[in-house]
């Protein structure tokens, strides 16, 4: 009996089919306008932009303008590049405009498709950000698609790694801005460390289209963007800890490959304790005493560095530095560093220069950065497998865009061998057969090491005409990948290296023109050469088609089906024939970790001989099931991490909004008065609690605290002896005295200098306390997981305690700002040369490090501008103290060290 759901789908169509039907109706509207727009001359077509903008100001919406705007871009693309967007590209453009993810097969024209919603949303004048995974793609797309936008009267900018602040500001001011996800995130963080609004470069987060959206919002979701400053140098300590690890044996630790964790056994712990004791670094009797928390952390990092991180797979050593390799793309990520001492442990392991650890100055995850956009959309060739995550976390629906022509690629069943040696013999055999008939081949590997091992095998077998593309040679990446479709081409690539560059059968015409004619000037000769290249590519394509089309060979399955699908999707573009096959062995990581024993037993029962493979759809399904389990686990990890990051994100928003308010304000007196009043109220409530008898009042402590904070000698003890005096009266007298002192100080300076000083103190204090708060949150996050053993929810504990820490930070902020403003003397007016410049931290990728002093530039300048006037010291007047050493006795006469007395607030 047919189920009711099946019957309903047959009668009404699925939700996907209904959505496509609605989009096709819009496509029909756009197509109906085509003839009308073809009749417009270039000037009339360009004037459509001004017309649309005028209609928007008169109340029309971008949704209503969509058919005409898309028709305009389609006609412009035809005139500029002789490329007419297909109907399926119009569908994809509408999905992007409606804040969805367009899953579009490789070679179907995502870059051109994106111009449709980019143009439409840029008409609002609020800026459109097009996000790519690297500088090369950002520059390429800005240059090529920018010609279409320029034809229509829109401006296009591109953010590259080495741009200065002025160039970035200009690029963000354009109608359309192309940039990498890293540059966007770091610019946002730097903007929120600026001293003045004029130093900021971004102008808001209106609409973003994320190319390769799965790579950025899924693969990179757990990686925070961090701007950091160096801490003290501990090179000797890292080297010492590193010497302990080689003497450990497998019985000293346990590795969980599924969870990618490593822990010491009891035997290993005892061994490490003895080593530390001999080296004089063990505090107390046990490694797990509270005093040894930091040492445990460093030892665990050293163990991870040696046993979990593999050279040429997870990182490479280049120019005496550790360079991380992206596990998903195989690309190097220069400048990115592991945090919390792990990178230093790797440097000690490889005996390269150890860079100091860094303190986080500001951070944000891609998850929270991209959720700031009012409108967010994305495009990729593979997103369906992660549809649930896109929906739950980003509220983005994945829509599979139909191909313009039917897919003719043949995806063959996996071949599974007992050992890796047998598998590689079969791969070489298969490569030889396909290579001899001139079929273009792409071989995908999972690491640099494996790509180079395969290359060496091929050389020994007499196959030498091939290109290796991995993190070592990423500079040639785009060109190598672009020509991988030439007949007889054999390319070995790590994972998805070259992603974003189209592999066309016969080769990439545009890439060849750029490469071969880069020095040839415009003219008849160049035009003739271009025609010659086009003719040659056409002939080469026919040869490649005759050889069977593009052949993708995978040497291993990835944990994620999506990465496998990306590799497969390289073949069969735009209706071309092709095939794909995965070669596996029971020694592969995925097979070994997830149930190879069971499969090994099954293969033995089948009597599988050496060099024989088993091929069956059932095995493909079993592997897919294992991959789904891994994907589900990784999704849960990312979702859980986001819950914790959301807590910090809420606090980050408060701090950044407060900073923005301070930067934009011309006069901060009202904010400062509010802070001061809250500090006084807190003081009085602490020492003279409301609704208590005067006998319970600690007026002496209150009097000392007032002197400590405000540099005021007030007779609070005398006031408290007056008959019938209430706490409200004491509060009022303190407030009046502080106000009087403030007014006297304010009269000494011009309003401009005072306002500048107020801003400097507020921003410097906020930034300092926020940095300390981030460290506290990291520490809390690292220990809160253990609360689960006490039947307490770690997330709720984290929320509660992080809120308490945040409240304490805000109280501390009010106290420190109030005290500083009551104690400092301004003796030098700021000059033009001292006006702060934008801080550029462009030296790195995901961990942006400041050079030298870890304070922003304006904070360093401030030390030259705001100083204490040295006179003979009067214990009751801190303005006479001059510079006091941190460990000197405090001049106030308390006999305490300065850093524990008045110096605590200076």
UniProtKB/Swiss-Prot annotation:
Membrane-spanning intervals of the chain: none
GO (cellular component) term, any one: cytosol
Protein family: Belongs to the SecA family.
Membrane topology: Peripheral membrane protein
HAMAP family assigned to the protein according to its UniProt record, in alphabetical order: SecA
Biological processes, Gene Ontology terms: intracellular protein transmembrane transport; protein import; protein targeting; protein transport by the Sec complex
Subcellular location: Cell inner membrane; Cytoplasm
Keyword Cytoplasm set for record: yes
Organism name: Bartonella quintana (strain Toulouse) (Rochalimaea quintana)
Entry EC no(s): 7.4.2.8
Free-text function comment from the UniProt entry: Part of the Sec protein translocase complex. Interacts with the SecYEG preprotein conducting channel. Has a central role in coupling the hydrolysis of ATP to the transfer of proteins into and across the cell membrane, serving both as a receptor for the preprotein-SecB complex and as an ATP-driven molecular motor driving the stepwise translocation of polypeptide chains across the membrane.
Family matches, as InterPro entries: Helicase_ATP-bd, Helicase_C-like, P-loop_NTPase, SEC_C_motif, SecA, SecA_DEAD, SecA_motor_DEAD, SecA_preprotein_X-link_dom
Record-level Gene Ontology MF annotations: ATP binding; metal ion binding; protein-exporting ATPase activity
Subunit (UniProt): Monomer and homodimer. Part of the essential Sec protein translocation apparatus which comprises SecA, SecYEG and auxiliary proteins SecDF-YajC and YidC.
Protein name, as recorded: Protein translocase subunit SecA
Bridged cysteine pairs (disulfide): none
Alphabetized SUPFAM superfamilies for the sequence: Helical scaffold and wing domains of SecA, P-loop containing nucleoside triphosphate hydrolases, Pre-protein crosslinking domain of SecA
Broadest EC class assigned to this enzyme: translocase
SMART domains linked: SecA_DEAD (SM00957), SecA_PP_bind (SM00958)
Catalytic activity: ATP + H2O + cellular proteinSide 1 = ADP + phosphate + cellular proteinSide 2
UniProt cofactor(s): Zn(2+)
Keywords: ATP-binding, Cell inner membrane, Cell membrane, Cytoplasm, Membrane, Metal-binding, Nucleotide-binding, Protein transport, Translocase, Translocation, Transport, Zinc
Binding site for Zn(2+): 890, 892, 901-902
Residues annotated as binding ATP: 89, 107-111, 502
């Amino acid at each position: 009996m047919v189920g009711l759901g099946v019957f309903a789908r047959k009668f009404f169509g699925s939700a996907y089919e209904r959505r496509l039907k609605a989009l096709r109706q819009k496509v029909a509207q756009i197509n109906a306008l085509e003839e009308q727009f073809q009749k417009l001359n270039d000037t009339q077509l360009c004037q459509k932009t001004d017309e649309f903008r005028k209609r928007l100001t008169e109340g029309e919406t971008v949704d209503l303008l969509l058919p005409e705007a898309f028709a305009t871009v389609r006609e412009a693309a035809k005139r500029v590049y002789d490329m007419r967007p297909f109907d399926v590209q119009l569908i994809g453009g509408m999905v992007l405009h409606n804040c969805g993810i367009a899953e579009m097969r490789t070679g179907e024209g995502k870059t051109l498709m994106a111009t449709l919603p980019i143009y439409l949303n840029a008409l609002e004048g609020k800026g459109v950000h097009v996000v790519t995974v690297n500088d090369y793609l950002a520059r390429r797309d800005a240059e090529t698609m920018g010609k279409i936008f320029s034809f229509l009267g829109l401006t296009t900018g591109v953010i590259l790694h080495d741009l200065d602040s002025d160039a970035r500001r200009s690029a963000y001011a354009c109608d359309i801005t192309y940039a990498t996800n890293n540059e966007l995130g770091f610019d946002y963080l730097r903007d929120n460390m600026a001293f003045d609004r004029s130093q900021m470069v971004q102008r808001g987060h209106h609409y973003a289209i994320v190319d390769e959206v799965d790579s950025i919002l899924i693969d990179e979701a757990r990686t925070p963007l961090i701007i950091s400053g160096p801490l003290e140098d501990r090179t000797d300590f890292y080297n010492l800890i590193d010497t302990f690890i080689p003497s450990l044996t497998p019985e000293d630790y346990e590795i969980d490959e599924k969870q990618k964790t490593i822990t010491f056994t009891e035997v290993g712990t005892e061994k490490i304790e003895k080593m530390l004791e001999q080296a004089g670094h063990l505090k107390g009797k046990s490694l797990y005493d509270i005093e040894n928390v930091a040492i445990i952390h460093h030892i665990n990092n050293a163990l991870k560095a040696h046993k979990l991180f593999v050279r040429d797979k997870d990182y490479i050593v280049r120019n005496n530095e550790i360079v991380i390799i992206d596990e998903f793309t195989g690309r190097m990520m220069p400048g990115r560093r592991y945090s919390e001492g792990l990178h230093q442990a790797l440097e000690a392991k490889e005996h390269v220069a150890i860079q100091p650890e860094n303190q986080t100055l500001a951070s944000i995850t891609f998850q929270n950065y991209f959720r700031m956009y009012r409108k967010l959309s994305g495009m990729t060739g593979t997103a369906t497998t992660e549809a649930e995550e896109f929906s739950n976390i980003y509220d983005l629906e994945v829509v599979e865009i139909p191909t313009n022509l039917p897919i003719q690629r043949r995806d063959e069943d996996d071949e599974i061998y007992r050992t890796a040696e047998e598998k590689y013999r079969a791969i070489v055999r298969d490569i030889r057969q396909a290579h001899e008939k001139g079929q273009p081949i792409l071989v995908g590997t999972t690491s640099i090491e494996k790509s180079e091992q395969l290359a060496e095998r091929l050389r020994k077998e007499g196959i030498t005409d091939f290109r290796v593309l991995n993190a070592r040679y990423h500079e040639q990446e785009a060109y190598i990948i672009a020509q991988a479709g030439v007949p007889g081409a054999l390319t070995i690539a790590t994972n998805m290296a070259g992603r974003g560059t189209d592999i066309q059968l016969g080769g990439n015409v545009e890439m060849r023109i750029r490469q071969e004619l880069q020095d040839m000037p415009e003219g008849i000769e160049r035009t003739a050469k271009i025609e010659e290249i086009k003719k040659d590519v056409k002939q080469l394509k026919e040869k490649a088609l005759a050889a069977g089309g593009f052949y993708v060979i995978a040497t291993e399955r990835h944990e994620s089906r999506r990465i496998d699908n990306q590799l497969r999707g390289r073949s069969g573009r735009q209706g071309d024939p092709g095939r794909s096959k995965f070669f596996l062995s029971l020694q592969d990581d995925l097979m070994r970790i997830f149930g190879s024993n069971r499969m090994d037993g099954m293969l033995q029962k089948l009597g599988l001989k050496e060099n024989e493979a088993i091929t069956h759809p059932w095995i493909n399904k079993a592997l897919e099931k294992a991959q789904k389990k891994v994907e589900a686990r990784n999704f849960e990890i990312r979702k859980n991490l986001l819950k914790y990051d959301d807590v910090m994100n809420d606090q980050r928003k408060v701090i950044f909004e407060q900073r923005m308010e301070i930067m934009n304000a011309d006069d901060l007196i009202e904010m400062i008065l509010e802070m001061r009043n809250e500090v006084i109220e807190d003081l009085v409530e602490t020492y003279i609690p409301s609704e208590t008898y005067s006998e319970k009042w600690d007026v002496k402590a209150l009097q000392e605290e007032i002197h400590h904070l405000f540099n005021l000698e007030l007779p609070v003890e005398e006031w408290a002896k007056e008959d019938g005096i209430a706490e409200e009266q004491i509060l009022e007298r303190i407030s009046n005295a502080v106000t009087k002192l403030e007014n006297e100080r304010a009269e000494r300076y011009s309003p401009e200098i005072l306002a500048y000083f107020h801003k400097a103190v507020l921003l410097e204090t906020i930034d300092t306390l926020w940095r300390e708060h981030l460290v506290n949150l990291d520490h809390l996050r690292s220990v809160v997981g253990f609360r689960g053993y006490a039947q307490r929810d770690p997330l709720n504990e984290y929320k509660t305690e992080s809120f308490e820490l945040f409240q304490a930070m805000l109280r501390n902020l009010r106290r420190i700002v109030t005290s500083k403003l009551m104690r400092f003397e301004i003796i030098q007016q700021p000059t033009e040369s001292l006006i702060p410049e934008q801080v550029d931290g462009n030296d790195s990728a995901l961990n942006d490090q400041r050079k030298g002093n870890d304070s922003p530039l304006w904070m360093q300048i401030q030390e030259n501008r705001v100083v204490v006037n040295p006179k003979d010291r009067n214990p009751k007047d801190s303005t006479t103290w001059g510079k006091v050493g941190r460990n000197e006795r405090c001049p106030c006469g308390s006999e305490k060290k300065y850093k524990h007395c008045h110096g605590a607030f200076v």
